[in-house]
């Protein structure tokens, strides 16, 4: 079983090497395999519980696995010895906790070795394949400030300094997620992971584009309902932002926001289909007035508030916003008409308290098991054709809410979960198939 795992890892690293073997200059950001991160987390837990014998057993097993991995991956004896020395150095940073007190904050030091081991081994493999490269440590240039957020000015300065120090190097490898905090301690970026690291580096060097390799494609519809949904080729930043809201697994919002701020395009590529152009996200708005995708969000609660006229209309609206803000509950959609306000939310944590407070000012209707369907594309307010086609497609499906995005990128609707699949099929037939 162990050998099978190693063979899979070897094939995986060889595949990564093929993905980056073109002649363009690049900085490659790498994550540790999930099973390695999980194993290192178990090591940290054993140290924290002072179960030293168990920790030793786990470290030894993983260390031998990495050495076996290097022996199978590499054929050049000199490079192989250097790689094994690099592996032993990383594990020395873990073994030291056998002799030292272990605190919960030390867990990050152990977990970071996964990224360091991965980048070290890939660097040696690429060297053996004749691809000159330099492995640069993220600890040397990725830093967070006192507020825990990425120190973008520092990162930009340091990345440029490192690139200047290697004028003849066109391929750099580094680690995703890991960083130093404001106190110089080993830490992780609070959110965004390797995608965010790539965005920070890409904007620092003003890259031509940021390529994110992910097995989550951006499709024009829910593939569980519409089997032949297409992969979207082009999106504007604002269109992508809307789709990511519905499916954060596509790309972390912080990665998108960072690239958008500096107008650096992002290309999403699937490692299982490396010849595909993927999805290109940029500031360009291609295909005017074209519907790009239909996205959904489930587990929605629909609430309608009808004022009982205890408050004036403007105070009634303000009160609803204030109470939702008080309980840190974000509406997904909101529409208003005179003294009626409709809200759709996916956060039920404090909903009973919110309704209890607002019951003094309004009659309230609540419906669970709803879905939001958002039609995303470049839809200018001057073009009424798309809206008309949406209404025509869904003329036999009850709509609880209709909400227009302020940035002219989407029209969102609230329907019952039981009507969702049929609505998606109708929108695909009437809008997406015709648009393509």
Describe the role of every protein-language-model region.
Residues 3, 7-251, 255-256, 416, ...:
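Nucleotide/pyrophosphate-binding catalytic subdomain
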Residues 141-142, 217-219, 274, 339, ...:
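Positions that flank functional sites
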Residues 239-282, 287-309:
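A conserved active-site cap/scaffold subdomain adjacent to cofactor or substrate pockets
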Residues 25-28, 67, 109, 132-134, ...:
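Structural motif
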Residues 277-436:
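A conserved regulatory-domain signal marking ACT and ACT-like small-molecule sensing domains
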């Amino acid at each position: 079983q162990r050998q099978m795992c190693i063979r899979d890892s070897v094939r995986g690293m060889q595949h990564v090497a093929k993905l980056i073997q073109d002649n363009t200059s690049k900085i490659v950001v790498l994550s540790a395999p999930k099973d390695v991160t999980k194993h290192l987390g178990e090591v940290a837990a054993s140290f924290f519980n002072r179960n030293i014998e168990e920790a030793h057993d786990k470290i030894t097993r993983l260390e031998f696995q990495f050495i076996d991995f290097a022996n199978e991956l590499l054929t050049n004896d000199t490079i192989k010895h250097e790689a094994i020395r690099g592996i032993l150095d990383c594990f020395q940073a873990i073994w030291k906790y056998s002799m030292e007190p272990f605190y919960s904050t030390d867990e990050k030091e152990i977990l970071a070795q996964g990224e360091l081991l991965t980048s070290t081994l890939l660097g040696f493999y690429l060297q053996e394949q004749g691809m000159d490269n330099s492995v640069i440590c993220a600890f040397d240039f990725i830093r967070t400030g006192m507020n825990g957020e990425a120190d973008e000015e520092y990162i930009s300065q340091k990345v440029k300094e490192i690139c200047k120090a290697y004028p003849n190097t066109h391929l750099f490898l580094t680690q995703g997620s890991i960083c130093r905090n404001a106190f110089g301690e080993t830490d992780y970026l609070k959110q965004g992971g390797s995608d965010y690291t790539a965005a920070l580096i890409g904007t620092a060097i003003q890259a031509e584009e940021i390529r994110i390799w992910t097995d989550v494609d951006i499709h024009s519809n829910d593939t569980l309902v519409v089997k032949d949904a297409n992969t979207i080729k082009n999106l504007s930043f604002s269109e992508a932002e809307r789709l990511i809201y519905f499916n954060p697994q596509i790309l972390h919002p912080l990665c998108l926001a960072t690239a958008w701020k500096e107008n650096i395009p992002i290309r999403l590529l699937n490692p299982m289909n490396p010849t595909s152009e993927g999805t290109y996200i940029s500031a360009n708005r291609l295909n005017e007035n074209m519907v790009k995708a239909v996205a959904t969000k489930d587990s929605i609660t629909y609430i309608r508030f009808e004022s009982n006229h205890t408050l004036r209309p403007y105070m009634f609206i303000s009160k609803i916003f204030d109470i939702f803000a008080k309980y840190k509950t974000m509406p997904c959609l909101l529409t208003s008409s005179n003294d009626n306000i409709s809200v759709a939310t996916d956060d039920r944590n404090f909903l009973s308290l919110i309704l209890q407070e607002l019951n003094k000012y309004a009659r309230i209707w609540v419906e669970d098991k709803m879905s939001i369907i958002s039609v995303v594309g470049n839809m200018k307010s001057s073009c009424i054709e798309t809206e008309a086609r949406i209404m025509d497609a869904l003329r036999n499906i009850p709509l609880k809410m209709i909400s227009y995005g302020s940035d002219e990128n989407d029209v969102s609707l609230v329907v019952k979960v039981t009507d969702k699949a049929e609505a998606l099929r109708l929108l695909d037939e009437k809008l997406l198939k015709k648009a393509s």
